Amino acid sequence: MPRVKGGTVSRQRRKKVLKLAKGYFGSKHRLYKVANQQVMKSGNYAFRDRRQKKRDFRKLWITRINAAARMNGLSYSRLMHGLKLSGIEVNRKMLADLAVNDLSAFNQLADAAKAQLDK
């Protein structure tokens, strides 16, 4: 069998890694070995943080809802319990959006929750 030279494939593979490492600092975008390590690490970070992002946004929504709820004399947990008792199904993302952009609508929801808790 004739000898197979893999120069073209190797060069393409290295070029692909260096292209992915574009914008990295120092030798991390120049040297293949270091760039490859950093590209692998970056992929791990990206994979982890795609899941972390969902948790981070939920935390942010809860913080915003809690702040607006306390302006209405309720804690976050009591507000959510009151909304559940009154049959209002609004997710945390929408509640947080109301708390930031439409405080009067949020206040109406908080009043409904308060009324249900006082029963």
Swiss-Prot record:
GO cellular component, one term: ribosome
Stored Gene3D superfamilies: 6.10.160.10, Ribosomal protein L20
Pfam name, any one: Ribosomal_L20
Keywords assigned: Ribonucleoprotein, Ribosomal protein, RNA-binding, rRNA-binding
Protein's UniProt keywords contain Nucleotide-binding: no
SUPFAM superfamilies: Ribosomal protein L20 (SSF74731)
GO molecular function, one term: structural constituent of ribosome
GO aspect biological process, one term: translation
Function: Binds directly to 23S ribosomal RNA and is necessary for the in vitro assembly process of the 50S ribosomal subunit. It is not involved in the protein synthesizing functions of that subunit.
NCBIfam families with a match to the protein in the record: rplT_bact
Protein name in the entry: Large ribosomal subunit protein bL20
Species, as recorded: Bacillus pumilus (strain SAFR-032)
